[in-house]
Every structure is written in structure tokens, then in C-alpha cells.
Swiss-Prot record:
Name of the molecule in the record: Histidinol-phosphate aminotransferase
Upper taxonomic lineage: Bacteria, Bacillati, Actinomycetota, Actinomycetes, Mycobacteriales
Catalytic reaction list: L-histidinol phosphate + 2-oxoglutarate = 3-(imidazol-4-yl)-2-oxopropyl phosphate + L-glutamate
EC number(s) per entry: 2.6.1.9
Source species, domain of life: Bacteria
Gene: hisC
Subunit comment: Homodimer.
Cofactor: pyridoxal 5'-phosphate
Molecular function in Gene Ontology: histidinol-phosphate transaminase activity; pyridoxal phosphate binding
Length: 377
């Protein structure tokens, strides 16, 4: 008897998962990948050799569980952040996990959940509502200004009126690229009833001071999350972390799975941190390339949202999906983030950006492009 292959509809899924699609950017084999905001500069030979040696050293103990609390890695992260932000931090201020998404999930497991709510200011990072849904946290949202910047007055009012347990702010914001000032964060923190999560995935690119500066000032209200997947060029290593007061770090111990960070991940990440200066040396070059791309797009007649990250949001296309397909047909993969009329492009290597700009100039001569020169917003 042949039994039909079951589908998702045949499974006893939770109701809130029915009809959903898995999250994830396209992974296609094309010459130019500018869709996931990675650092395009590969690791140095010295870093690769260090990772190999470090992993080889722990491999003899792979029959044993790793350090459950990743103390040595967290100490290294604290030292890195102290040097990077100028704010003295210790191991007690740091928590680490498999990418910043796991960090965000743990935060909502601890501070969200059934009967609680989280608010975001859209468009922003699309995983925030997905993680809220996955933890049964009610998702609330307020729309950003027409230029995609955060309307702080509206945000303060929304938080004061709706009293969410968790507030999400991405700075720089993905997909628009704007950062928020410490003064504006203080205004929000003064009305936040629960915790404010400042998602600094692109923090190393930002021209503004890190929100880490506010941890001592608002010890029970603020958590800063970061990743090594962007400027730090360690996307394949899958490491995210948070910075907070020790009590908030302790809360993560209540929800984290035991031995969640493998000994291989911990060893490789510690090796990568030893080469932080070399890796982050590419940030200035990427910012310069971002500005070159921005000026070129504006010259072609596109509207470009000023960015403080390693990507640009640009438009306004009459048919964003058609424009995205044209880029792909020329071997350039960028991101359609679902904002009508806009696409997002990662800043790549100079030759990758040249290919992107060539495709952009072709689109500028078609009916897909803006009808008039709008310039930077």
C-alpha cells in the first residue's frame, strides 16, 4: 500500500505556524552576492591558521561537553567591546549564543511570552516579529516616517500608550540604515515599562556612539545585541552576543539550552577575536565604497536613503520586483525587502559594486527606474 507523502497541512502544527513560509534570504550561485550584508573581505591567512590551530586543540576533547557558560569567550568579547566602545565591561556583562537571532529569542523567552507584548518600528529587521510569534509574544508595530527614519515623538507616544513589555530598536536600522542618537534612546528609555533591546548588528559601521554607554545609566531597562556576522566577517561562525547589566545576563541562564555553544564555535570565535583589528580594518574601505555607490545611484536618478551601515536602500522603482529580476539576470543578487518601490544592496568589493552600478545604469534607462531625479533623501 502506497501512503501519500505527507505535507505540512497533514501535521499537527500550531495554528500560528500554518500558512507561514521559512525566513531566509535567497542563496543562489551568482557572480555578485549583495543581498545578506556580509563583509565581502575574506579572513586573512593568519586568522584562518589561528582558527585551524584553535579548533584542533579542542578537537581532542570533543567527547566532552563544552564550557556551558562560555566564560573565556565572554571575557574576550568584553575586552574587545571595552576597546571598541571605551566603556569598561566584564564577563558578567556579556552573554553569547549561536548568532544574534538566538540572543533575541532568548530575550523574548525571558521577557516576552504569552500575555506579554513587544513593539517594533517598521520597516525594520524582519526577524523581530517572527521571533515574537515563535515565543507567543504579541507583536505590535508603529510605522516609521516617510524617509524611514524613527519619528521619536511618535515612538515615545506609542510606547507610553501601549506599554509593551519589550521594545525593539535597530541601530543602524535594517533595511534603511539610519542610526539613533543616545539622546533619543534616553527619551524612549524614560517611558519604557519593560526592557529596550537595541539591535546593533551593524554597530561597527555606525558613526554614532554605541548604546552600550547607557547600560550603567538604565541597568534594568536596556540590552544591546550584536553579531559577528556583519563587520566582523564571521557569518559562517554563527556568533551573537549581548551587553547588559549582570542581572539581565543572569536571566539568560534561565532560558538558554545547556551547552548551547559548541567547543568548536567557542574556539573559532576566540581566534577570530584575536584578529579583530585586522578584520575591522576593512570597515573604512566599505564605508568609502558605500558613499561611492550612493553618489553614483543619486547621479542616475535614484532616491537613496542615507545609510550608517554597509548597505543602501534605494528606489523608487515603478516595479521593484522587475528591477530585482533585472539585477539577477545580470549576475547581481540584491534584496527585495518588501518595501514597495525599494530594493536593498549590500556594499561589496569595488569590482562587485561596479557590476551592481552597471546593472543600475541599465535599469535607469528603462521604465523600471524613477521618472525624475529625486536624489538622496
Amino acid at each position: 500500500m502506497n501512503v501519500p507523502e505527507p505535507t505540512l497541512d497533514d501535521l499537527p502544527l500550531r495554528d500560528n505556524l500554518r500558512g507561514k513560509s521559512p525566513y531566509g534570504a535567497m542563496q543562489l550561485l551568482v557572480p555578485v552576492l549583495l543581498n545578506t550584508n556580509e563583509n565581502p573581505h575574506p579572513p586573512t591567512k593568519a586568522l584562518v591558521d589561528d582558527v585551524v590551530r584553535s579548533v584542533q586543540k579542542v578537537a581532542v576533547d570533543l567527547h566532552r561537553y563544552p564550557d556551558r557558560d562560555a566564560v573565556a569567550l565572554r571575557q574576550d568579547l568584553a575586552s574587545y567591546l571595552t576597546a571598541q566602545t571605551g566603556i569598561r565591561l566584564g564577563v558578567e556583562n556579556i552573554w553569547a549564543a549561536n548568532g544574534s537571532n538566538e540572543i533575541l529569542q532568548q530575550l523574548l523567552q525571558a521577557f516576552g511570552g504569552p500575555g506579554r507584548s513587544a513593539i517594533g518600528f517598521v520597516p525594520s529587521y524582519s526577524m523581530h516579529p517572527i521571533i515574537a510569534d515563535g515565543t507567543h509574544t504579541e507583536w505590535l508595530e508603529t510605522v516609521r516616517a516617510d524617509d524611514f527614519s524613527l519619528d521619536v515623538e511618535a515612538a515615545v507616544t506609542a510606547v507610553a500608550d501601549r506599554k509593551p513589555d519589550v521594545v525593539f530598536i535597530a541601530s543602524p536600522n535594517n533595511p534603511s540604515g539610519q542610526s539613533i542618537s543616545l539622546a533619543d534612546l534616553r527619551r524612549l528609555l524614560d517611558v519604557v515599562p519593560g526592557i529596550l533591546i537595541v539591535d546593533e548588528a551593524y554597530g561597527e559601521f555606525s558613526s554614532r556612539p554605541s548604546a552600550v554607554a547607557l547600560v550603567g545609566e538604565y541597568p534594568t531597562k536596556i540590552v544591546v545585541t550584536r553579531t559577528t556576522s556583519k563587520a566582523f566577517a564571521f557569518a559562517g561562525g554563527r556568533l551573537g552576543y549581548l551587553i547588559a547589566t549582570p542581572a539581565l545576563v543572569e536571566a539568560m541562564l534561565l532560558v538558554r539550552l545547556p551547552y548551547h555553544l559548541s567547543s568548536v564555535t567557542q574556539a573559532a570565535a576566540r581566534a577570530a577575536l584575536r584578529h579583530a583589528d585586522d578584520t575591522l580594518g576593512s570597515v573604512a574601505a566599505l564605508i568609502a565604497e558605500r558613499e561611492r555607490v550612493t553618489k553614483s545611484l543619486v547621479h542616475m536618478g535614484f532616491r537613496v536613503i542615507p545609510s550608517d551601515a554597509n548597505f543602501v536602500l534605494f528606489g523608487h522603482f515603478s516595479d521593484a520586483a522587475g528591477a530585482w529580476q533585472h539585477y539577477l539576470d545580470t549576475g547581481v543578487l540584491i534584496r527585495d525587502v518588501g518595501i514597495p518601490g525599494y530594493l536593498r544592496a549590500t556594499t561589496g568589493l569595488a569590482e562587485e559594486n561596479d557590476a551592481f552600478l552597471k546593472a543600475s545604469s541599465e535599469i535607469a534607462a528603462t521604465e523600471l527606474a524613477p521618472a525624475t531625479t529625486l536624489g538622496a533623501s
